């Protein structure tokens, strides 16, 4: 189970990692109930509010509904969604390669629509994804923001999954470690008899 800041508990499925004896808790946000999605957005917005972002930027795919909901809770009129589908008016200069723990061999690119550039240039940006696990997806988002001279004031997600992301974000994110926040954390798990314990 994963405990939210307000004390409520989420029961998440455990996914064994092949050949390791370890496992991770799994969160697939678009398969969660609306109540769970709302609770995670509430918790993340509360964690991001002290950083006073002007705009929330969201990473595709599952980070987009969370970013939108967080932006609404922060009182913003809109958010800045990044995308992986290239429209004909996009600028390749506003893109970076993208892979993730769930699609490591993908050759996608992460794009910012040039029309959204005025929203993020010079702004206090909070960059949001659903889960930060290996740190590859969020690092791509940080790289894209760096191309336009923006260092986010905070990085947020619903679930900080294990600690594997820390080294990659230490390289990619110029902000302080405490500016990386999640609605909850989920440790790496190790087999313990018939169940699992924190590794």
What function would you assign to each model-found segment?
Residues 60-66, 134:
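Gly/Ser/Thr-rich loops at beta-strand to alpha-helix junctions
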Residues 129-138:
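Acidic, divalent-metal-coordinating active-site segment for phosphoryl/phosphodiester hydrolysis
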Residues 1-52:
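Active-site-facing substrate-recognition patch
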Residues 65-74:
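Short Gly/Thr/Asp-enriched flexible loops that form oxyanion-binding sites at enzyme active sites
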Residues 55, 124-126, 154:
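Structural motif
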Residues 139-199:
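PRPP-dependent phosphoribosyltransferase catalytic core
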Residues 53-60:
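Short glycine-rich phosphate-binding loop at a beta-alpha junction
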């Amino acid at each position: 189970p994963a405990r939210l800041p307000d004390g409520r508990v989420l029961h998440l499925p455990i996914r064994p990692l092949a050949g390791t004896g370890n496992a991770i808790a799994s969160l697939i946000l678009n398969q969660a109930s609306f109540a769970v999605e709302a609770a995670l957005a509430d918790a993340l917005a509360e964690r991001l509010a002290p950083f006073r972002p002007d705009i929330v930027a969201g990473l595709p795919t599952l980070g987009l509904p969370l970013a939108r909901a967080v932006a609404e809770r922060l009182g913003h009129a809109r958010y800045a969604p990044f995308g992986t589908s290239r429209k004909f008016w996009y600028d390749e200069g506003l893109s970076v390669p993208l892979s993730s723990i769930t699609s490591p061999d993908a050759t996608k690119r992460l794009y910012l629509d040039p029309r959204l550039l005025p929203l993020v240039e010079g702004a206090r940006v909070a960059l949001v994804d659903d889960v930060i696990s290996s740190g590859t997806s969020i690092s791509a988002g940080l790289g894209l923001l760096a191309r336009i001279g923006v260092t986010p004031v905070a990085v947020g997600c619903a679930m900080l999954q294990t600690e594997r992301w820390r080294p990659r974000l230490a390289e990619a994110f110029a902000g302080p470690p405490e500016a990386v926040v999640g609605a909850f954390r989920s440790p790496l798990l190790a087999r313990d008899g018939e169940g699992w314990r924190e590794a």
